[in-house]
């Protein structure tokens, strides 16, 4: 009896490993542009170094055709002037529509960016110096679903007191931003970008825009990358 059970177990492990290895999510992507969250899901990151230049390829997945960016500044420490500085830099760094239409983006006349707001975590929220991706998703569940939710990408800027964790990777040291999505209780996919804190507003916005564009052209991990 032991041998059949062992064979079944080995087959199960092999099947699981095969499924992970052949998952269409970010399959064939540059390894340095991928991290794994605490739910064993691969996500696309902006690494803290330049990647080899290569033309993105299309993998058959969805694109956010009429994207809207909603900037959220989490927690304390975000003065109004600082928020305005990052907001302005984000708009200035956004690629023109001409460079996005080739990927199927149809925003007109440009990508809409909603004025940044300060966002306070729920009462009793505790952290351990950083946030995992699943903890961030739990906080984002509190956002009411708007009429353009399917086209909305929330861009979450973390405070200096919070880091972000993707498995063993730490925000700032191992990645400058990342994007992901999850099935919201409000229905549909809630798409978001997470941007760990940086003192330079220009560099902060630049990393945010890079990840936002990735979230638009590659929301499911099967689009352009």
Where do the PLM segments sit?
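Post-HEXXH active-site segment of zinc metalloproteases
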Residues: 221-225
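Long, well-ordered early-domain segments
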Residues: 127-157
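Hydrophobic, Leu/Ile/Phe/Ala-enriched alpha-helical segments that form helix-helix packing faces
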Residues: 87-95, 139-147, 212, 216
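Positively charged n-region of N-terminal signal peptides that target proteins for export
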Residues: 1-4
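Active-site-proximal segment of zinc-dependent metalloprotease catalytic domains
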Residues: 145-219
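Bacterial N-terminal signal peptides
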Residues: 6-15
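N-terminal carbohydrate-binding/catalytic regions of secreted carbohydrate-active enzymes
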Residues: 22-138
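Sec/Tat signal peptide C-region and signal peptidase I cleavage site
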Residues: 17-19
């Amino acid at each position: 009896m032991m041998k059949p059970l062992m064979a079944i177990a080995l087959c199960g492990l092999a099947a699981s490993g095969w499924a992970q290895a052949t998952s269409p999510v970010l399959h064939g992507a540059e390894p340095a542009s991928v991290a794994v969250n605490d739910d064993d899901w691969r996500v696309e990151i902006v690494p803290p170094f330049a990647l080899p230049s290569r033309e993105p390829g299309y993998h058959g997945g969805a694109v956010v055709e009429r994207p809207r960016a909603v900037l959220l500044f989490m927690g304390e420490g975000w003065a109004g002037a600082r928020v305005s500085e990052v907001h302005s830099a984000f708009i200035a760094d956004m690629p023109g529509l001409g460079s996005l239409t080739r990927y199927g983006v149809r925003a007109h006349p440009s990508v809409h960016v909603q004025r940044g707001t300060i966002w306070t975590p729920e009462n009793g929220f505790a952290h351990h110096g950083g946030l995992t991706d699943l903890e961030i998703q739990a906080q984002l569940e509190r956002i009411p679903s708007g009429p353009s939710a399917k086209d909305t990408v929330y861009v979450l800027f973390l405070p200096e007191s919070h880091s972000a964790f993707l498995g063993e990777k730490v925000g700032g040291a191992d990645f400058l931003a990342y994007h992901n999505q999850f099935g919201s209780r409000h229905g549909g996919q809630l798409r978001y970008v997470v941007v760990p804190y940086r003192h330079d507003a220009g560099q902060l916005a630049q990393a945010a825009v890079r990840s936002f564009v990735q979230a638009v052209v590659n929301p499911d991990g099967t689009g352009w990358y």
